[in-house]
């Protein structure tokens, strides 16, 4: 099936209403480079125990440890407003998804190791929140489902694509993507600010959102959700906006 050209973030993005989470692109690239080096080279002068720990960390980076965890639901961030990256507009809103053939598309362009591992852990039929990010009012706008589990992201091999990775090889691809299909819009827009209010209350007094990754790992564009987190956030669509 032919797909129109559209791109998302690199897998790590901060929302405009969370300035403390913003990290310069060069710093983000440095972090990913350091993470890659850690996954391929053992520390110099490692003891036997140190080498053993490094091997465990390497398994985790390659998806070994995290991908074994069964998550029920997900949160996928995408940018609804135009932004050029290497001359290509990376805008992709939920309306863009609805306009795709069969309201289905591949979720490509993730270039963060932890986000990639979460993609690889996704199972057929699991649902995810579609989250508008890096915009004036970030938040949840709809629900999608996984219709194809992780497979190699073709954009890593396309030199004209902003997410091209010259270090990736077709015989051992670094990056993966999944296919997602539109399920429905949420009954109302659920803003980040409202979710954060509940997160802070639950963090203080206990509740399903106390450990929500949306606030502990703000930069990740692919995030897991527990059943309790998903159910609570979804219940907010029934309430009047604060």
Curated annotation (Swiss-Prot):
Gene Ontology CC: nucleus
Annotated compartments: Nucleus
Keyword Nucleus: yes
Extent of motif Nuclear localization signal: 6-10
Expression by tissue: Expressed at high levels in bursa of fabricus, thymus and spleen. Also found in the liver, intestine, heart and brain.
PTM text: Undergoes proteolytic processing during lymphocyte apoptosis.
Region (Disordered): 1-64
InterPro entries (UniProt xref): 5hmC_binding, EVE_domain, PUA-like_sf, THYN1-like_EVE
tRNA-binding listed as a keyword: no
Broad class of where this protein is predominantly found: nucleus
UniProt feature, compositional bias: Acidic residues: 28-37
Record keywords: Nucleus, Phosphoprotein
Described purpose of this protein according to its UniProt entry: Specifically binds 5-hydroxymethylcytosine (5hmC), suggesting that it acts as a specific reader of 5hmC.
Protein name stated in the entry: Thymocyte nuclear protein 1
Organism: Gallus gallus (Chicken)
Gene: THYN1
